Amino acid sequence: MRKLALSDEILLTVEKPARYIGNEVNSVMKDKKDVEVRFAMCFPDVYEIGMSHLGIQILYDMFNKREDVWCERVYSPWTDLDKIMREKNIPLFALESQDPIKDFDFLGITIQYEMCYTNILQVLELSQIPLMTEERAKEHPFVIGGGPCTYNPEPLADFFDLFYMGEGETVYGQLLDTYKEWKASGADREAFLRMASHIPGIYVPSLYEVSYKEDGTILEMKPKYEDVPAKVDKQIVMEMAEAPYPEKPVVPFIKATQDRVVLEIMRGCIRGCRFCQAGMLYRPTRQKDVQVLKDYAYKMLKNTGHEEISLSSLSSSDYKDLEELVTFLIDEFKGKGINISLPSLRIDAFSLDVMSKVQDIRKSSLTFAPEAGSQRMRNVINKGLTEDDILRGAGLAFEGGWNKVKLYFMLGLPTETEEDMKGIAHLAEKIAKRYYEIPKDQRNGKCQITISTSFFVPKPFTPFQWAPMSTMDEFLGKARVVNTEVKEQLNRKSLKYNWHQADVTILEGLLARGDRKVAKSILAAYRKGCIYDAWGEQFHYDRWLEAFEETGLDLDRKSVV
């Protein structure tokens, strides 16, 4: 009989106790005596966020198809349970078996965004695993990281035994087999890390030495041993038809951020926007066969009971069989009470026709992502979108009955001028003007245009990776320019302007491009109580400033690398 790690008393005390009990529909139960490798798969955020992540579902399904492996899930406990676990010395546990993570062979952590870095330390500490790799002994699990942030893993190098670069479907089979071989040999912990470093795509930070220039930037990074590769190449799945995909994804007990069947239609993007890390990392573009996707749609809906299905990719409009797939989903499932959720599509006649069939026009809004206010700036970032394209798409939408538009822009892009910033308000005004050119009796009420600006963060492996980042004052000054210009527009009552937190952006930029010296600052911030930094109400910028000051890092340095 499976026993819960938390008592009824604790479960009735914390918010959303279903986060911690496991045993959901399609979760995999095995006898731990029948497997050779136990793997805890972690998303370092709250359950509802982690359960929405497709990558975890793919790897969970792939691992558990092996008879010799049992993969279980673990998420960051919310702050209420975090406090109780520390007070009562309860080790963090896996959802399926409810066993402590410290008893597993591996703890795999997907690292999707920089603002979860302190949560990684929370997971390690609550699991009673030493935070620093150098302090771990043979009885501790190996801690492995994956995901987009591992393309610059250096800020986390002190906390992880190894990372995989690229798509996990290609790496883990060989890694698990290597682990079994090492375990049977009885060799020490470093022996496994040396063996793992020979696997394409595996990076073991402790096997590399880093030297620095006088100004603090990296001079050289080289392997400590001749058999350790000097360069680690990312690994990708080239044949999408052969890539594993979960026909029975785990169904959460409580509403997740994305509580639906997800069909991944393609990987990669053909666009090449110069600021976009995902577009660069996930090259080349690879598409899934439309018949395979139709088959997955049937099976996944049947196996989950979900009432919604959505498409996943970086650029869905570029999927060659999009029209056939969307038409099939509408014809097959719309009449059966299944909602069809479409990603952001290029706004053209086909897209609007499709959206009108699956959305309530009076309630839904259309999203445009011009990214920059002027054509000059859009050319600099290689957006491939003209003002005529935007106005034509908006006009088609307005004529089709829509009256709500969301516009997404970035501030602080390289070579940006004040005119580029003001162009954001001017473009929004032109879109509003286009709406009011429609005869009044054909309009759907008042036009509502929401302008949102994020602040540019130069990310590794993008053409802008070495670009300087604006300071806090500069970011806020740019937002004020846009805000003032919006208020001066003729149709200002139809325009609403929101901007992202500048302090979060500053921190994200340092963590994205930092080196191993940043690890001590992350640890210091964690010791000051920083966790859930991606959650606005939990973010404490003042504590981060204290941590950087105490560890000797200059957060305002424009060329942080």
Feature map (PLM): residue ranges:
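Radical SAM enzyme core and accessory elements
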Residues: M1-M29, K33, F39-M41, E488-V561
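N-terminal [4Fe-4S]-dependent radical SAM core
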Residues: I10-A40, Y47-E48, P205, S211-V262
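N-terminal pre-triad scaffold of radical SAM enzymes
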Residues: F39-D45, F63, P249-F275, L301, ...
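Conserved SAM/AdoMet-binding glycine-rich loop
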Residues: M41-C42, V46, M115, Y298-T450
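A short beta-strand-loop structural module common to alpha/beta enzyme folds
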Residues: E67-D80
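Glycine-rich beta-alpha loop elements in corrinoid/cobalamin-binding modules
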Residues: P77-K222, P460-D515, L523-W535
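A glycine-rich phosphate-binding loop feature that marks nucleotide/adenosyl-phosphate handling sites
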Residues: M195-V204, L314-Y319, P343-A349, G412, ...
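Iron-sulfur (Fe-S) cluster-binding segments and ferredoxin-like electron-carrier domains
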Residues: C276-V292
